[in-house]
Regions:
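Intrinsic-disorder/low-complexity signal
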Residues: 1-144
Length: 144
C-alpha cells in the first residue's frame, strides 16, 4: 500500500467521521472492492443536489470538477472542487454481472492508504453510498 502498511490502516465504523487523508497534492482516492460494482461520484451542493450532469462522475463521464473516475474508484482533487460543492458522495452499484443484491457480498471502501470501511449489514440493496468527502472546516471523510 502506498503511504502505509496494512498495520497503519484504520477501520471506519458506519457514521464515523475522520479528517480526510489527503496526499501532498490535496487529493484523495476512494476505491470500492468486493464485488463487480460500478463506482460513481456525485458532487453535491449544500442542498444535497447536483448542479448539472457534469456533477455525476462515472465510467461514461470520467472527469468532473475536481473528480476523476478510475475503474473501481475515484480520485478527488480537493483543490479543484468548486466552492459551492459541499460533499462528494462515492457510490457503488451492482453492474449486473454478479449477484442481484449486496446481501452477503463482502463490500469495502478504502480511502487513501489509511482508512478502510467494511460495508456490512447490506441485504436487498443494489446501490449504496459508501463514503462522503465533505468540506466542513477542513476536508473530512464519513462512512455512510
Amino acid at each position: 500500500m502506498a503511504g502505509g502498511t496494512l498495520a497503519d490502516v484504520q477501520s471506519l465504523a458506519r457514521g464515523e467521521n475522520r479528517p480526510a487523508p489527503l496526499d501532498a497534492s490535496g487529493s484523495i482516492t476512494v476505491s470500492v472492492t468486493g464485488a463487480a460494482v460500478d463506482v460513481s461520484a456525485l458532487l453535491l451542493t449544500a442542498a444535497g443536489r447536483v448542479r448539472s450532469d457534469q456533477d455525476l462522475v462515472f465510467f461514461n463521464n470520467p472527469v468532473g470538477p475536481g473528480v476523476r473516475y478510475a475503474p473501481d474508484g475515484v480520485t478527488v482533487d480537493t483543490r479543484g472542487v468548486p466552492a459551492e460543492i459541499e460533499t462528494v458522495a462515492i457510490t457503488a452499484s451492482l453492474d449486473g454481472s454478479g449477484p442481484a443484491t449486496f446481501g452477503g457480498v463482502p463490500l469495502r471502501a478504502t480511502v487513501g492508504s489509511e482508512l478502510d470501511f467494511p460495508m456490512t449489514g447490506l441485504t436487498t440493496e443494489t446501490a449504496v453510498v459508501g463514503v462522503e468527502i465533505s468540506d466542513a472546516d477542513g476536508w473530512k471523510v464519513r462512512a455512510v
